[in-house]
């Protein structure tokens, strides 16, 4: 269940409330079940997956990818598996914990773990959205945002791409009003 936190401390957990608060950004948020396949769930329990295991998992949820290809023109996908044992993880994550934008939409399907996206709304107020397993988010191109993990530093996410050129972060000078949880 997604959790949206406003700067004044207000917290929303109902999808209709979260959607209302994010409507000015045109962010899409959906609940996408992973399914009941035991092997799929076993793969999600592992920190490190081989390329073959990643592909096996991706194929188990490809019905979502097929829908995105048809409706939004996505061309490829991969499975990102972040865990604390990744060398230089903090340096890698530091590329995304500052306000930035991307030239393309950022589409993520969180399948394990927890992550936080923060957003700057058109009125310059800020919100933070905690995403949990089985939640899909699409952040439109040029939306000012940041990203970080919980202290556990574990997340698995399917990333959907319409191209790879638009994934370079373009940093802004906006100061983040929230403190990392």
Curated annotation (Swiss-Prot):
Enzyme class name: oxidoreductase
Superkingdom of origin organism: Bacteria
Residues that, per the record, bind Ni(2+): 100, 102, 106, 145
Pfam families to which the protein is assigned, alphabetical: ARD
SUPFAM superfamilies, per the entry: RmlC-like cupins
Keyword flag Oxidoreductase: yes
Obligatory cofactor(s): Fe(2+); Ni(2+)
Site label May play a role in transmitting local conformational changes, positions: 105
Catalytic function, reaction form: 1,2-dihydroxy-5-(methylsulfanyl)pent-1-en-3-one + O2 = 3-(methylsulfanyl)propanoate + CO + formate + 2 H(+); 1,2-dihydroxy-5-(methylsulfanyl)pent-1-en-3-one + O2 = 4-methylsulfanyl-2-oxobutanoate + formate + 2 H(+)
Annotated site (Important to generate the dianion): 108
UniProt-annotated binding residues for Fe(2+): 100, 102, 106, 145
EC number: 1.13.11.54, 1.13.11.53
Pathway it works in: Amino-acid biosynthesis; L-methionine biosynthesis via salvage pathway; L-methionine from S-methyl-5-thio-alpha-D-ribose 1-phosphate: step 5/6
GO terms of molecular function: acireductone dioxygenase (Ni2+-requiring) activity; acireductone dioxygenase [iron(II)-requiring] activity; iron ion binding; nickel cation binding
GO biological process: L-methionine salvage from methylthioadenosine; L-methionine salvage from S-adenosylmethionine
Cofactor binding remark: Binds 1 Fe(2+) cation per monomer.
Family affiliation: Belongs to the acireductone dioxygenase (ARD) family.
Oligomeric form and interacting partners: Monomer.
Function: Catalyzes 2 different reactions between oxygen and the acireductone 1,2-dihydroxy-3-keto-5-methylthiopentene (DHK-MTPene) depending upon the metal bound in the active site. Fe-containing acireductone dioxygenase (Fe-ARD) produces formate and 2-keto-4-methylthiobutyrate (KMTB), the alpha-ketoacid precursor of methionine in the methionine recycle pathway. Ni-containing acireductone dioxygenase (Ni-ARD) produces methylthiopropionate, carbon monoxide and formate, and does not lie on the methionine recycle pathway.
Protein name: Acireductone dioxygenase
Organism lineage: Bacteria, Bacillati, Cyanobacteriota, Cyanophyceae, Oscillatoriophycideae
